[in-house]
Amino acid sequence: MKNFQDKVKKLVAEMRRVNQIHFIGIGGAGMSGIAEVLLNEGYQISGSDIADGAVTQRLAKAGAKVFIGHQAENIEGASVVVASSAINESNPEVAAAKEARIPVIQRAQMLAEIMRFRHGIAIAGTHGKTTTTAMISMIYTEAGLDPTFVNGGLVKSAGKNAHLGASRYLIAEADESDASFLHLQPMVSVVTNIEPDHMDTYGGDFEKMKETYVRFLRNLPFYGLAVMCADDETVMEIAPKVGRQVISYGFSEKADYRIEDYQQTGFQGHYTVVCPTGERIEILLNVPGRHNALNATAALAVAKEEGIANEAILAALADFQGAGRRFDQLGSFIRPNGKVMLVDDYGHHPTEVDVTIKAARQGWENKRVVMVFQPHRYSRTRDLFDDFVQVLSQVDALIMLNVYAAGEAPIVGAESKDLCRSIRNLGKVDPILVSDTSQLGEVLDQIIQDGDLILAQGAGNVSKLSRDLAESWKA
């Protein structure tokens, strides 16, 4: 422990040439986590975001200087600027930093510096990485290891998305969206799945994306460990190319850590994990869905391979409350047509939406599933249009909101009205397009029935809309 602390002190001393670290997009989940860890390490932190919120307010209260809006003068005093992947070269703070010859780096480059003298565990994949990161963090915490963790979403059990621990362990979500996870040099890497997403980063070439994952895994030292999902065809395709020890997990009979007998009752999942030694471990989860069983088994595999006792693993998983905006129950409400349950979920890729619907069907077999879906980005809607049409046709009733642009310009044929038309033509559900979100509650009241499960689905502001709706329904 002393040797590790001496190394960290050396790194901090070397970085003391950095007087102030400025984050552009400090309110983002990944950015705020790194800012919080560095703030707790004693650095001066400043940052800007386009909107105020709970995250920016928490950072300001902790001592960060937070600006709302992007302006050149915000970087005054900064020794380095960290920019999120959503920030482009035309941003006034980026331009001002470059003019002043202040280094501008990616989020993952700063995360790599934090990881440099630590035992890094990096979790990557198209889906499930936030929840898996949270689960591993809670297992290591339960084991008394006090890890540092940086997650892309709220770890509900901890009440935050980042923590500066006293031990050598650093558990971090790795971002493939801009390929910046290649900066990381972990000891253990997890890959949950690989599917086409953020394809602009990879020039629309899925083969290039797969090769980038191989490069990420080859960043492991020769004695490192790759924990990979046996159920994902693409993950297993690249596994032989990694050149490092690979441990697999999943429902597949070929998995090293194999899931058996999964059952779900409401929010609870029960199943057995058969370990490589033949040991059988009974798991209780308080988060629903087979996808969460996969996430938990990835976390279990990491912990078992690193020598953590079963007691800590089982206790952490049984107590796990979920990650923020992952099948997040907002409450049950009495409406004019009966009692309904409202759930908020971040899933915005067809596969994520699909597993959320399946979790709802499996846990609440006799309920209608009513979805309020907000597509996220025109480019994603265009690239995965047919998949969205098929997946969204599985619900009993569908309200479609306008595409949340996330800074993108509209793309012809990739708007919500286009999705609605194609879903309607499929003939399974008749979607309702709600362009004025102030009418959402009224429209819902017209279509919901007693016992309905309402899923507010998407990565944009649909979460705020659903939470505002929940507050109004409580009144």
UniProtKB/Swiss-Prot annotation:
ATP binds at G125, T126, H127, G128, K129, T130, T131. It is an enzyme of class 6 (ligase). Its EC number is 6.3.2.8. Keywords: ATP-binding, Cell cycle, Cell division, Cell shape, Cell wall biogenesis/degradation, Cytoplasm, Ligase, Nucleotide-binding, Peptidoglycan synthesis. It comes from the Bacteria. One of its GO terms (molecular function) is UDP-N-acetylmuramate-L-alanine ligase activity. InterPro entries: Mur-like_cat_sf (IPR036565), Mur_ligase_C (IPR004101), Mur_ligase_C_dom_sf (IPR036615), Mur_ligase_cen (IPR013221), Mur_ligase_N (IPR000713), MurCDEF_pg_biosynth (IPR050061), UDP-N-AcMur_Ala_ligase_MurC (IPR005758). Its main location: cytoplasm. GO terms for cellular component: cytoplasm. GO terms for biological process: cell division; cell wall organization; peptidoglycan biosynthetic process; regulation of cell shape. The keyword Cytoplasm applies. PANTHER family: UDP-N-ACETYLMURAMATE--L-ALANINE LIGASE, UDP-N-ACETYLMURAMATE--L-ALANINE LIGASE-RELATED. Cell wall formation. NCBIfam families: murC. Belongs to the MurCDEF family. This is UDP-N-acetylmuramate--L-alanine ligase. It comes from Glaesserella parasuis serovar 5 (strain SH0165).
